[in-house]
Amino acid sequence: MSNKNPLNNSNGSNSSTIVNSDKFLVKIHSLSVSHTSKSSNIYLVGDFDQFKQFKTETKKSSSTHGSCIYNEFAMEFQYETKYIHKLDHKHFKICVYKKKSIGSDKYIGSFGVDLYTLATGPISHDVVFQKDNTGVGRLQFRLEMNHITDIQISFKSILLSNLMKQSNYQIDYSLNKINPLKSSIIENTICPSWYNQSSILMNISLKDLVDGSIFFNLKDTKSSKVIGELKLPVKSIFSFVEGDIKIVKTLLYNEKQNKICDACIEIQFNNIPQLAQLRGGIQTEQGIRGAESFFSGVPLPKIIGEISNASTSDGYSKEAQLQHVKLPDGWESRIDPVSGKVFYLNHNNKTTSWISPLEHAPVKKRTPTVVISNTTILDNNNNNNNNNNNNNNNNNNNNNNINNTNNIQQKQQAQQQPVQPPPQPVQQQVQQPQQKEKEKEKEINAEDYKISRPKKTPATPEEAAVIIQRTFRNHKKQSYNKTIRNSKTIIPPNNVQQQQPQQTEKPSIYQVFGQQIDQGLPNGWEVRQDQFGRVFYVDHINRATTWTRPTVKHPKQHQQATLVQQRK
């Protein structure tokens, strides 16, 4: 069954702005009540955000536990809303009534829950329904609420190489083998390449997407045979980031599982659903029990995600609640032997992170930074960040804002897509951009690969911005500046940071040159020593510094220069 929301109907010329509605597939079934009026005719009335209403048939409750089971009831519909960010202000309510032969029916009690909890929590519910804030019975039901969007899977490039023979090739691709798309035919080649192929468009939920696979079939058009196949599980490459781009390096095999060719595929996911329900578990009046987070980064219900650290009325704190929610499939928590802190290991893509996959971040667009090789995610972030930091240090006067933006984006990406290992703190990256040797870390063997101990990152993007600004100002004060505004603090002419000598006591300028240091210098010049013991020369007339010792001009030239200076 489907029902259109009348609020979505436009009035033609009166509508100036079109707002797209988010859609949810809702299914309600397995309703039952217990511990209520015994041997009574009971029926239920439901209201889903004033969008869809229902009423069950009347059944007689048992004489022992006062229970009624409505196995025959099941309802499906498509719910639409323009305000997905306000689901916590929308509610689903079930009222329990006792049918009377004479007079109006008796209201027994009701239960209500917000739609955000339904869209992010478990499917099963076993809760207390109340009347005047007093529990009068129990209500059981299952409610599936799947956020669906028109997902777009784009293929920026499909590159094949090392084919056995030169021929004409075509490749078709699909999601879950539904409506496969075909590429153009590349003739007389052993390395066919396709760029910007038609995108896969499918109205699907996040669960169906992540649990699905992308299939590729390579066809030799001369023989009209499929010579190679590839099944790419979405779970192995997907990250809960809008516009994320993955570069997959893998192999195509024939029916006998023999290698046919190498493949490099660039895939992008757009318009992904934002919400998904937990796997398994049940919701009760005491919270959620036995559930598993669907995927890293997917929002959690408020009953878990927004409970304060203090114990709740039923004695459960936020940490206690989280213990009843399992990590997503393929995730494991471990304790760092050095710091004693808990970190998280993702066996799906062999990465580590300090951030729990149960903590979600808002959907953000980002540039491609992750490469996947043989179903293993490789880290390109460190090299890119080091290059960016080197360039920023060489252009200090122009790139302050770029530094701030890059580091804030780096923090957001670290939360949304863990890397191996997590990036270094921003302050260390800026102060030491050319540092090649890193501190050796203890490594933890995890099956057939090694995972380095994660490194700590700033807590928030704002904290990272403060650190980068403070570091930039300190670095700028120490860099080369031709204009000397304070003669007491003259900066030597050095725009490249150099290592400090190992000696603890550096010789003074008088120990190096004796008493002849100021002799032989032109008028207005002075010799000084920097913090590393190096000698430089200060031109007070032009307000400049140099490493080169100035030479005394010929007396005639010196007199001419003096006259010119006096005229000025």
UniProtKB/Swiss-Prot annotation:
Residues 6-129 form the C2 domain. GO terms for biological process: actin filament organization; cell migration; mitotic cytokinesis; negative regulation of organ growth; regulation of DNA-templated transcription; regulation of hippo signaling. Residues 325-359, 519-552 form the WW domain. Disruption phenotype: Cells fail to complete the final step of cytokinesis and form multinucleated cells when grown on a solid surface. Null mutants show excessive accumulation of F-actin around the periphery of the ventral surface. When grown in suspension, mutants lacking dwwA complete cytokinesis normally. Mutants lacking the N-terminal C2 domain fail to localize to the cell cortex. One of its GO terms (cellular component) is nucleus. Residues 380-418 have a biased composition (Low complexity). PANTHER family: TRANSCRIPTIONAL COACTIVATOR YORKIE, YES-ASSOCIATED PROTEIN YAP1 FAMILY MEMBER. Interacts with calmodulin in the absence of Ca(2+). This is WW domain-containing protein A. It comes from Dictyostelium discoideum.
